[in-house]
Amino acid sequence: MSHLKSKTAVITGASRGIGAATARHFAAEGANVVLAARTTAEIEAIAEEIRGAGGAAAAIACDVSRYEDVEAVMVLADTAFGGVDFLINNAGVIDPISHLETSDPDGWAQAIDINVKGVYYGLRAALPRMKAAGAGVVVNISSGAATSALEGWSHYNASKAAVLSITRTADKELGDSPGRSVGLSPGTVATEMQVLIKASGINPVSQLDPSVHIPTDWPARAIGWLCGPDAAEYRGDDVSLRDEDIRRRVGLID
């Protein structure tokens, strides 16, 4: 993926799962990566691993529900690497899984703060920089839950529906500029989130056999592809990694 070489990617939720895999993939393709997450020790370790392999990486603690934290991430990208070319809005939570009538109002609100405000704050901080630079790609991690409600996931369903709308709005506002916004619905991925889902025992997703979950490398590679010119036709859209045609275009299957 030559389009990633020497470019700079900001990745939120980069301490584990899809975020960590994306940081490693982008770095392996020659990109500078800025890892952001609440757990500093984990992202520092990944950044050190990348640097040890000859890559360029920086890490910074960030709570995406706080705009000042997100702005600080962009400032680090500016100072360390000269700007931001790609923003991967990956940070998100699925806790607390609960039926509406027994849900915790504070936990529900916190999930919205992270899953929705976090995406908005990332866009708010990155778009002025991308517009000034004349290019840039934002990939927002979406979900089939945006359009297909699942029991016990009212907070997650609502937040991912909001992310889908924000993705489309951002792309409309980018207009005919080289910049674009796109969503990726990865499907079920072998991450810690699936452990929480299975433990809940609520809705059909919790009953899935772990063998059906795709590895984190798949969405990481799909995100890399979405940042390139071959995926420009999907701007403003929500791309599903369940689609075999998409998997072929990414190079995941023959």
What are these regions (language model features)?
Residues 179-187, 191, 200-249:
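C-terminal helical subdomain
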Residues 15-16:
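Conserved glycine-rich cofactor-binding loop
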Residues 98-100, 104-109:
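Substrate-binding pocket helix/loop in short-chain dehydrogenase/reductase
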Residues 128, 172-173:
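Alpha-helical segment proximal to the catalytic Tyr-Lys
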Residues 143:
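Residue(s) in the substrate-gating loop at a strand-loop-helix junction
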